[in-house]
Every structure is written in C-alpha cells, then in structure tokens.
Amino acid sequence: MIAKTVAILALAGSAAAYAPTMSLSANRRELVQGAAAAAVVAPMLRPTGASAKDAQLRAPVVTIFDARGCKDHANKEYTDPKAGNAENDECCVKVQMTPIKVADDAAALVLKECLSELKGKK
C-alpha cells in the first residue's frame, strides 16, 4: 500500500514539475485538472486496516517431551544418529499451531471482570 502511494505521488510530482505552463497564473482548466487528479489520488491515501488476523484463531502450542531416565522400553521411533549427549537424546520439543477455541460465556466473563477492574481503579 505504501509503495503504491509513493509511486502515485512521484508520478503526480513529476507531472507537475514538467508541466508546460505559459504563465504563472492558474486558469479554470488547470484548476479542474488538479481537482480531478486529487479526487483520483485521495481514495488511495486512506489508511487501511491490518489484515494479519488469523481466521482460525490459531496460536503456537509448545509441548516438551522429557524421557530422561525412562527405562521402560527401547526407543525405536528415532533412527538418525544421536547427539552423543544422553540429556539431549532423550528430550524433544514440539511446536504446533493449534486452533484455540473459547466459549462465548467464558469470553463474556473475562470481559466483565476486566471492565469491573478498570471501573474500580478510578
């Protein structure tokens, strides 16, 4: 959006800088042309809202698996070479984007509590 705005302003600026003018006074035709150009550029200069919201309301969930000292069975899942350090070989971290679901009644309760705390601080 910013690049588009800069390009339009640069184009308008270069057109204004090299416009052939016979006199310094602006006539009616030039005023109408300037107003038309401003009307075209004005909608492009409006601020736009952020579009970064995740539609599924997902958040990263970190799960830590720690099997240090576990002697119940031999691990057969991992077949690559081991790190050589027993502590690192028996630990795993999993990060997964998971949809977060919040019930409407829970959200209303949190909102009510926050508003009551804000009103109490006056």
Swiss-Prot record:
UniProt superkingdom: Eukaryota
SUPFAM superfamilies the UniProt entry points to: Non-globular alpha+beta subunits of globular proteins (SSF56568)
Keyword Membrane included in the entry's annotation: yes
Further comment: The light-harvesting system in Cryptophytes contains phycobiliprotein complexes. Unusually they are composed of either phycoerythrin (CPE) or phycocyanin (CPC) but never allophycocyanin (APC), with only one type of biliprotein being present in any one species. Unlike cyanobacteria or red algae these proteins are not arranged into higher-order phycobilisome complexes, and they are found in the thylakoid lumen.
Sites where the protein binds (2R,3E)-phycocyanobilin 2: 68
Family stated for the protein in its record: Belongs to the phycoerythrin family.
Biological function: Light-harvesting photosynthetic tetrapyrrole chromophore-protein from the phycobiliprotein complex.
Amino acids binding mesobiliverdin: 70, 76-77, 92
Protein's recorded name: Phycocyanin PC645 alpha-2 subunit
Gene3D superfamilies referenced in this protein's UniProt entry, alphabetically: Phycoerythrin alpha chain
Chief location of this protein within or outside the cell: plastid
Record-level GO cellular component terms: chloroplast thylakoid membrane; phycobilisome
Annotated organism of origin: Chroomonas sp. (strain CCMP270)
Record text on subunit structure and interactions: Heterotetramer of 2 different alpha chains and 2 identical beta chains which form 2 alpha-beta heterodimers within the heterotetramer.
UniProt binding sites for (2R,3E)-phycocyanobilin 1: 54
GO biological process: photosynthesis
Keyword Plastid annotated: yes
Protein's membrane topology: Peripheral membrane protein
Modifications after synthesis and translation: Contains two phycocyanobilin chromophores and one mesobiliverdin chromophore with binding mediated by both the alpha and beta subunits.
Keywords, comma-separated and alphabetical: Bile pigment, Chloroplast, Chromophore, Electron transport, Membrane, Photosynthesis, Plastid, Thylakoid, Transport
Short name of one Pfam family: Phycoerythr_ab
